[in-house]
Amino acid sequence: MIELKYTGQEDALEESVLTLLQDYDMVDECIIGSMNKGILQKMKELEPGISTVFIAHDLEEEDYELDYADSYSIEGRNLTVDMVDAIHYCGKSVYGWTANTSGVMLRIVNCGADGVITDDVRLLQTFLREQACRKAFASVY
C-alpha cells in the first residue's frame, strides 16, 4: 500500500504517483491509501481500476459506501462488529490499524476484520498462533 498525504508542498500528487506506477507497470500491484477523500476520488478518476483504501480513525455511516474506496483501514480501537458487518454488506473489506498490542489485535480479530496492520509482526504471529490453538481447543471441548 502506498499512503498519500497532502503536505501543501506537492504539485499534481495523484498524477505524479500514477505516472510512476504506470512507468513501472505497478498499477495492478499497488493499493493507494489515504485519509484524504479527495486524493482517493482523484486517483479513481485518473485510473478507475486502481485499488484504493480509505484510512480513518473512525467512520460515519455515510462513509460506508464511498464509490472511490475499495476497502477501509480503521483504527483498531474504534472498530465495531456492526461497522465491519455494514462495510462487508457493501462488498468491501476492512483492515484494523495499528495493532501493536495483543488487546488491539484481539479486538480487530473479534470484530471480523479482513486484516491487521501492525508494526510488530512477531507479536502478531505469536498472537495468531495462540488464537488458533485456543479456537482448536474450544472446538474439541
Question: Which ranges hold each PLM region?
Answer:
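Short loop-to-alpha-helix "cap/lid" segments that border enzyme active sites
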Residues: 1-141
